[in-house]
């Protein structure tokens, strides 16, 4: 695997993004791309001399010019290099470039880092994403419809998040099959980087505090949303480390077992059902933080958020986590 950069900058103006500030002092356009030939020369060298067969474009936004992006992939393929690749972009650009994705998939595209950020239009507007929830939804379906995986970038909590935003995010997550996405996107919190509009707004509102040279911690404007974050963090602090370790271990083991299945040449009568069972356990474990947040939101709406106690809220989740650990151990004993 090799990482490379084919362009610099981004022509969009998200309030939370440090890219604008980073390149502000540089003369010229906000987005600058290397020539197709120059990029392909580097990729061919990495493939033939370095043995790379998968390329990850670390461009701030690889898909600013879809035609150029496709030309890069097709030009390398024309040189006889067998490879796969991945890149980062925005939801609205995926939608606008929909017609290119069948060719991208054929050229070797395997996954896209999709900057969705939110399932709440209010949050998208505050962040100045200049996209819609509908575009986020459409972008996911375009990727999945072309057998391209989506690596989802999400901002669950930002300084002005409301409980309604959180509920809309959860609705979006559930309705798009992201319930259990790992790492859990429901834990993501906006970072206030120096020079960003989001940071300036938080400082002006008097809710940001800390060193001027770092990502600032901040207080949430909405008291109920702040309480939800506290309850979620306290609950995850109790079992989160052990949970992460087990989920990652299961990911690694499933990858090994699936490789064994591929080598088994059809002799899978014993291994296949156990791997399926392990996948079910993985799915259940990965969903636990999502179930926890869903419980916090539901019970907070019913009884008020302030009286809720993390120790009581997390008991069902902790019970299921411990039960899942035992089930996983039993499956492993049978493998």
Question: Which role does the model predict for each range below?
Answer:
Residues 1-150, 158, 171:
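Radical SAM [4Fe-4S] cluster-binding motif and immediate context
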Residues 12, 67, 122, 126, ...:
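Flexible glycine/acidic-rich beta-alpha junction loops that bind and position SAM and/or redox cofactors
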């Amino acid at each position: 695997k090799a990482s490379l950069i084919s362009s610099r900058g981004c022509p969009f103006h998200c309030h939370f993004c440090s890219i604008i500030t980073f390149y502000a002092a540089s003369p010229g356009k906000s987005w600058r791309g290397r020539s197709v030939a120059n990029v392909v020369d580097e990729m061919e060298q990495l493939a033939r001399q370095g043995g790379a067969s998968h390329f990850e474009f670390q461009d701030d936004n690889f898909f600013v010019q879809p035609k150029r992006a496709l030309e890069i992939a097709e030009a390398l393929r024309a040189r006889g290099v067998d490879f796969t690749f991945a890149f980062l972009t925005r939801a609205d650009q995926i939608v606008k470039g929909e017609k290119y994705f069948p060719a991208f998939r054929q050229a070797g595209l395997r996954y896209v880092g999709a900057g969705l950020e939110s399932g709440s239009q209010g949050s998208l507007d505050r962040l100045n994403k200049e996209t819609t929830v509908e575009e986020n939804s459409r972008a996911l379906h375009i990727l999945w419809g072309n057998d391209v995986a989506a690596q989802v970038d999400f901002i669950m909590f930002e300084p002005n998040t409301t409980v309604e935003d959180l509920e809309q995010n959860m609705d979006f997550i559930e309705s798009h099959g992201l319930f259990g996405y790992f790492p859990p996107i429901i834990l993501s919190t906006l970072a206030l980087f120096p020079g960003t509009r989001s940071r300036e707004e938080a400082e002006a509102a008097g809710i940001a505090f800390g060193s001027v040279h770092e990502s600032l911690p901040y207080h949430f404007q909405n008291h109920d949303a702040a309480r939800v974050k506290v309850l979620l963090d306290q609950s995850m602090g109790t079992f989160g480390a052990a949970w992460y370790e087990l989920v990652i271990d299961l990911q690694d083991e499933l990858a090994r077992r699936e490789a064994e299945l591929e080598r088994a040449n059809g002799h899978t009568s014993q291994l296949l059902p156990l791997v399926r069972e392990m996948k079910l356990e993985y799915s259940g474990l990965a969903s636990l933080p999502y179930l926890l947040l869903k419980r916090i939101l539901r019970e907070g709406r019913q009884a008020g958020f302030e009286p809720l106690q993390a120790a009581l809220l997390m008991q069902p989740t902790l019970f299921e986590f411990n039960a899942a650990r035992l089930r996983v151990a039993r499956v492993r004993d049978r493998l």
